[in-house]
């Protein structure tokens, strides 16, 4: 109902889908509540900030419509890592391939993956409802619908959202893949910077970066893996190495819990920032 239920509310977290967010935005904000929205409804609106606190927290203060948008999960964890490199040298280009867990499509999708594994191992026919194909023992190189340029909406979100968050002309080319992991998204990232960045520089920047944990010891087989990082708050970084084809290129691997940092935690961090800065 469109009533005065939000009168006296300082912060409202919304995570009920783009349609619901659009319908109720004015009702939620009309008495001064700050709406922190987890849907895609407002992310690319020019008068609504798109915020990852480790990267562009101050943008949250400029919200003429009383709304702050939470970015897409894959974008959030990527820009937290990119910020550390951007502080060393401007990033010109990013190529990223994502390995996105089943739970990124919702709890029912995660349940379907469980069911599919049981069915395959029992020799039964496989239930396919939440994905275009069987995900168990498979990879699906499509997340969301395809656009006219051959990229999916998920991939284009990474292009547009990254530029808005980082206030940059950075070019992003993404390939987003659904993988049969239960939770936490992984990303293989290649960046081209204006000047060469050494592995040592990058490692130090990641180690000091806000919201990042360095896990990069290949000799001991230590690197981020989704199996062990579900439920963790930070973005983990490893497999840091120089590109062999471009002296200004650097490659690394990140893993983050898309339900925590990729959604809920990021929204809470925005609220904490507003409270801390007395910016409500």
Which role fits each region the language model picked out?
Residues 1-6, 93-98, 102-251:
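C-terminal substrate-binding/catalytic lobe of Rossmann-fold NAD(P)-dependent oxidoreductases
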Residues 1-135, 171, 235-236, 240-245, ...:
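N-terminal Rossmann-like NAD(P) cofactor-binding subdomain of oxidoreductases
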Residues 12-13, 69-70, 146-150, 191, ...:
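A generic structural signal for short
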Residues 57, 196-198, 259:
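Generic "edge-of-domain/loop-turn" microfeature
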Residues 177-180, 256-261:
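Glycine-rich phosphate/pyrophosphate-binding beta-alpha loops
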């Amino acid at each position: 109902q469109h009533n005065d239920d939000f009168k006296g509310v300082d912060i409202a977290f919304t995570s009920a889908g783009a349609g619901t967010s659009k319908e109720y935005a004015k009702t939620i904000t009309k008495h001064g509540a700050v709406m922190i929205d987890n849907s895609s409804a407002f992310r690319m609106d020019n008068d609504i900030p798109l915020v990852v606190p480790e990267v562009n927290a101050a943008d949250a203060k400029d919200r003429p419509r009383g709304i702050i948008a939470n970015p897409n999960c894959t974008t959030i964890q990527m820009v937290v890592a990119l910020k550390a490199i951007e502080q060393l040298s401007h990033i010109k280009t990013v190529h990223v391939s994502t390995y996105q867990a089943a739970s990124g499509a919702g709890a029912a999708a995660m349940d379907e993956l469980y069911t599919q594994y049981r069915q395959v191992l029992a020799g039964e026919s496989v239930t396919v409802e939440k994905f275009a194909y069987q995900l168990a023992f498979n990879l699906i190189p499509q997340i969301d619908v395809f656009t006219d340029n051959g990229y999916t909406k998920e991939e284009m979100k990474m292009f547009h959202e990254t530029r808005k968050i980082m206030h940059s002309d950075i070019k992003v080319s993404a390939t987003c893949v659904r993988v049969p992991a239960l939770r936490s998204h992984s990303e293989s990232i290649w960046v081209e910077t204006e000047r060469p960045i050494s592995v040592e520089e990058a490692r130090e920047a990641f180690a000091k970066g806000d919201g990042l944990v360095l896990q990069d010891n290949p000799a001991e087989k230590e690197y981020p893996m989704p199996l062990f990082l579900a439920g963790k708050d930070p973005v983990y970084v490893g497999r840091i190495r120089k590109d062999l084809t471009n002296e200004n290129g650097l490659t690394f691997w990140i893993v983050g819990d898309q339900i925590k940092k990729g959604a809920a935690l990021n929204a809470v961090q925005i609220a904490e920032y507003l409270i801390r800065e007395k910016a409500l």
